[in-house]
Amino acid sequence: LQTVATQRLTAVNYRLLATEVMDTLQRDSRVRAELVRSIGAKADFGHMKVLADRSTMPADVAAMVHRLYSPHEVVINEDVLSFDVAAFQVDLICVPPIEYDTARDYLAFNVLGSLMGRTANRMGFKYGHSGLRYKLRDGDFLVADIPVTTKMAAAFDFLGYDYRRFTESFHALEDVFFYAASSTYFDPVAYLLQARGYRDRACYQKRQNYRFFIEWLKTTGTAAGSSAGLQREHHLQRAMSQFPDFADALKRSQEAFAGSRRRKQIFNGQIVAELTGLEGEALGQLMRRLHDAYPGGRPEFVAWLDQLQDHELAVLHAYIEDMAIDASVRTKSLHSTSD
């Protein structure tokens, strides 16, 4: 919050306020919501996190918050609404229904989700609010962001974590640290801030418990897991074997990208310009006409490009040249008519 001074609460007072906040939210509305799980021995709290299913909320969530809690301030940051109740900050985290179960596990137990996310990243995957995902890239270009699984027990198992132990909760922050380091794929190197980009370093330096974890690693001398050295390609093959739907989606994305790249190689502005001598606005108009004037329109033109073999490109070039001549004839005809 930016203008309202807020306080920290002891665990006892936090739980009393949490009961009041949740009772108010669920008594006066049909919102599906719950407190984000916290560490059992946490002595005091600086804010309260409430996870809510966006589909069960009214269109104007801020108006609902004002009506229910009469806060002095409401700050909206993407899908998080922060507001004050009894001089204490409440963060209402709104997620789509498909992400509710994954988000409730990812957000639980303080910094654990972020720590597990570093192990996932080291393996070539992303672990977050929407479960386990894979980003298909071509260099720095993001080709596709593909779901691997939204079943959290399966995601934990893939990352080398015991989901049953996770569901038993954690008493102290050190228990969370031990758990984060328990994966056979865990590597302490993944957490060193100097190995991160500037934005990541700035972000994580502000997170006290993340810094505590790094100090804990140094103090305990925690070693890498027995399988930490496995390459990303190994984990990708594992994921394709364990999650058939992901394997199918990955294959489709790879094929679509390969098709798109080849289309750009055989049909682009430079090729059309070289064949026709056109440039600027005239070139742009012809490019659009080549798509739209093809029998069946743009989708059929793209399908035709995809089926053309390298030895058949002369047919494409002839089509381009014919369309350029046709466009030129049309332009001259229009000029003569206007004269």
Role assignments for model-derived ranges:
Residues 20-28, 64-68, 115-123:
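Generic non-transmembrane alpha-helical segments
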Residues 41-62:
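Catalytic metal-binding acidic patch
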Residues 36-44, 82-84, 92-94:
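Short, flexible, solvent-exposed loop/turn segments with mixed acidic/basic and small polar residues
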Residues 83-86, 93-254:
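Catalytic cores of NTP-dependent nucleotidyl/adenyl transfer enzymes across multiple folds
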Residues 224-339:
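Charge-dense, extended regions
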Residues 55-70, 105-109:
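Helical (often loop-to-helix) elements that flank the catalytic cores of nucleotide-handling enzymes
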Residues 1-37:
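Helical scaffold of the NTase/Pol beta-like nucleotidyltransferase catalytic core
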Residues 28-37, 63-79, 125-132:
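Short secondary-structure junctions
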